[in-house]
A protein has these predicted regions:
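A compositional/biophysical signature of low hydrophobicity enriched in polar/charged and small residues
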Residues: 1-142
């Protein structure tokens, strides 16, 4: 599907605020509100917009501590639903380079992170040759 300039503008605005009213989107893009509505509906139907989600403040919901676990090995072949559905697992990405996976953990604090890491090593350690942990000190862009 080919996206034109107005589609890209709408998508950028919706990424910033998915609840922005059509009249604000119309004003920002210079197209009528009814056209905004039709374009958004088309983008949804074509799968460009997959879903709308709330961006939560991690501190407010008990996930003020964030860390990244860089993994070498092949645990992705053995990770199960328990892992992917764990409350602390925010993101998992297969990557190229020195590591095979990057796991983003968001949890209440250091103690909970250490407990999670210990459980991860116990359950998946035999599939992992190395982990490197980086604690997030500040989120610069969300």
């Amino acid at each position: 599907m080919e996206l034109d300039t107005k589609d890209r503008q709408l998508l950028s605005l919706l990424e910033s605020d998915a609840k922005a009213p059509a009249h604000e989107l119309a004003q920002a893009t210079g197209i009528p509100p009814s056209t905004v509505h039709h374009r958004i509906t088309r983008l949804e139907q074509q799968g460009v917009i997959e879903r709308y989600a709330a961006q939560l403040d991690p501190k407010q919901v008990g996930r003020g501590f964030a860390a990244f676990i860089m993994v070498t090995g092949s645990p992705e072949k053995y990770l199960d639903d328990d892992f992917f559905e764990h409350d602390y697992v925010a993101e998992v990405a297969a990557v190229t380079g020195s590591y095979d996976l990057v796991i983003k953990i968001e949890c209440p604090g250091l103690q909970e992170f250490n407990e999670f890491l210990q459980q991860f090593r116990e359950k998946y350690g035999k599939y992992v040759s190395q982990t490197v942990t980086m604690v997030c000190t500040e989120t610069l862009v969300h």
